Amino acid sequence: MNLLIDKITKDQLRSDIPEFRAGDTVRVHAKVVEGDHERIQLFEGVVIKRHGSGISATYTVRKISNGVGVERTFPLHSPRVAKIEVIRHGRVRRAKLYYLRALHGKAARIKEDRRKAFK
């Protein structure tokens, strides 16, 4: 049974996903259906967590919009996500950045990982 599930999900995995992790700033191009037409909506922010593996992997992106923190969780291999762009790599020492929820302004900044920026 497990081999069957692995075989089915392997076909669904996307290969165009860039390498990113918590602390990186990403721009997600999400497909949004409004009525009878579909458009692309951009969501740019800091990845605060990645969860799971395989077809069920997800990641959460946080941004500040009009002074209010907005977090959105996306499935990693979803066809509703048109493209993921990595804007900059952040240097953090945690896998889950929940502490950013309590920080405001300049305190919520993340240092850039210069070693990854040149690759």
UniProtKB/Swiss-Prot annotation:
- Which protein family is it in? Belongs to the bacterial ribosomal protein bL19 family.
Mention any one GO cellular component term assigned to this protein in its UniProt record.
cytosolic large ribosomal subunit
Single GO biological process annotation from the record: translation
Keyword annotations of the record: Ribonucleoprotein, Ribosomal protein
Q: Which organism is it from?
A: Pediococcus pentosaceus (strain ATCC 25745 / CCUG 21536 / LMG 10740 / 183-1w)
**In this entry, which stretches build a coiled coil?**
none
Q: Which gene encodes it?
A: rplS
Q: Does the keyword section mention Membrane?
A: no
User: In UniProt terms, what function does this protein have?
Assistant: This protein is located at the 30S-50S ribosomal subunit interface and may play a role in the structure and function of the aminoacyl-tRNA binding site.
The highest taxon in the source lineage is: Bacteria
Q: Name one GO molecular function term.
A: structural constituent of ribosome
Question: PROSITE patterns of this UniProt entry?
Answer: RIBOSOMAL_L19
A Pfam short name = Ribosomal_L19
- Transmembrane region positions? none
Q: What is this protein called?
A: Large ribosomal subunit protein bL19
Give the matching InterPro entries: Ribosomal_bL19, Ribosomal_bL19_CS, Ribosomal_bL19_sf, Translation_prot_SH3-like_sf
